[in-house]
UniProtKB/Swiss-Prot annotation:
This is DNA-directed RNA polymerase subunit alpha. It catalyses: RNA(n) + a ribonucleoside 5'-triphosphate = RNA(n+1) + diphosphate. It is an enzyme of class 2 (transferase). It comes from the Bacteria. Keywords: DNA-directed RNA polymerase, Nucleotidyltransferase, Transcription, Transferase. DNA-dependent RNA polymerase catalyzes the transcription of DNA into RNA using the four ribonucleoside triphosphates as substrates. HAMAP family: RNApol_bact_RpoA. The N-terminal domain is essential for RNAP assembly and basal transcription, whereas the C-terminal domain is involved in interaction with transcriptional regulators and with upstream promoter elements. Homodimer. The RNAP catalytic core consists of 2 alpha, 1 beta, 1 beta' and 1 omega subunit. When a sigma factor is associated with the core the holoenzyme is formed, which can initiate transcription.
Amino acid sequence: MIQKNWQELIKPNKVDFITHGSRTHATVVAEPLERGFGLTLGNALRRVLLSSLRGAAVTAVQIDGVLHEFSSIPGVREDVTDIVLNIKEIAIRMEGEGPKRMVVRKEGPGVVTAGDIQTVGDVEILNPEHVICTLDEGAEIRMEFTVNTGKGYVPADRNRAEDAPIGLIPVDSLYSPVRKVSYKIENTREGQVLDYDKLTLNIETNGSVTGEDAVAYAARILQDQLSIFVNFEEPQKEAPQEQVAELAFNPALLKKVDELELSVRSANCLKTDNIVYIGDLIQKTEAEMLRTPNFGRKSLNEIKEVLASMGLHLGMEIPAWPPENIEDLAKRYEDQY
């Protein structure tokens, strides 16, 4: 009875994932949902997508010749504050755990981009075209980045280590791989009911995870968090006893002829004539058997003797043979022959 509380609620019969040909944008459409569930699920998924998925980000930077973020660098058009803001926008995918180090060194004139950064094996820059700073003629810059993994948003002051060396500038870290999430609720029809909910989620990521995977991870987080509130065991359905259908013939006919103790010559003749089961064999007449190539009286007498020991003989008529599911029936009744 209690299971009707959740079993009789309508669930989406389909969830469509539309990628728009991009790894960073996706649309997820789920319908139909009970009235009100579009808002409930949409809001919950949005909050988890933005706050709880793990990713990688720069946590600190050290620039040669710079002691603090309010400095300026000769020959560099941006001041350090602007450079730090640009560093925050570097999109990173890291397979392992941190912290890891990345280095960039470049001479002017030219633009320093995220693609100029030298990374270690399991760290990948996802937006290599992103501009970090601009160098004039004769200018040179060297920066070392600290990269770590985490979730959500961590302000710079929490990234500041007590034993940090002078010149190490902490950076605000946006670990979440999801940049934007929006959703809308519309009415949809199911049968004669016109006011079920249709949930449409629009997701933008930094490319380290697809929108489809991001939704799956968020749903798994919600599932795991909500499971603690379930204080009962799932009611068990009584498994219906399997009904074994009555056969219209002797189960022994489902036995394969290669299980009979026949001579090699007789067995090969039956195989040549495509006789697989005893049910195939006993429907043959003696005359038909003797027309089989290389099949003689000796083989015929041998088969007649084996069949007689089973209460069978050649030339029998079997209604409904062969059955459609003969292989399944043979496995089911193998203990009876």
